[in-house]
Amino acid sequence: MSASLPRPLVHVGVTVPDLDAAVRWYSEVLGLVVLSRGATVRAGEGYEGDAASDVFKAGFGEVRIAHLACGNGVGLELFEFVRPAVEPSREDHHHARITHLCFLAPDLEEATERVVRAGGTRVTEHSWEVIEGQPYRFSFCRDPWGNVIEFHTNSFEQIFSNQGTDSAGQQ
């Protein structure tokens, strides 16, 4: 089994209150490719409804789902829960959940301004070095629905593979 590790990340699921607007936003602002949009799945209706009921458990009624693809083939699965309806996201980041999505953007300022012009907000006041003294930079913003988006100037492997220490400075 270890011969097939590390496992590739296939997709990330994100809940939004307006699926159609989110599909437009992620495709127009971040350039993701729309693979499917707006499939409706209802509890008790067919195979998909039974599977969704098993995943989302008691209280699940209806969800709309769209699938988008990033430039490296990793998917973004967007969910708009209809029954029960989507509730606003909590702003705190210390609860167990996915904290952000990170996209490659060699021009951080251009990427951040594009998000802001399209209804998102800036989180960090400016870009920062990922590791002090090294050329790799990041910035954070939010999409119009409050989901946190990070931009990196370089790939994850470029930034972290040759550091030789963990984040606490331990060998």
Residue spans of the language-model regions?
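Core segments of cupin and vicinal oxygen chelate
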Residues: 15-73, 117, 134, 166-169
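Short beta->alpha transition motifs characteristic of CBS
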Residues: 13, 152-158
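Basic/polar N-terminal segments that are highly enriched at the extreme N-terminus
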Residues: 1-5, 163-171
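A short local loop/turn or secondary-structure capping micro-motif enriched for an aromatic residue
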Residues: 85-88, 156-160
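Short amphipathic alpha-helical segments
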Residues: 27, 114, 153
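Vicinal oxygen chelate
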Residues: 6-7, 17-21, 36-42, 70-148
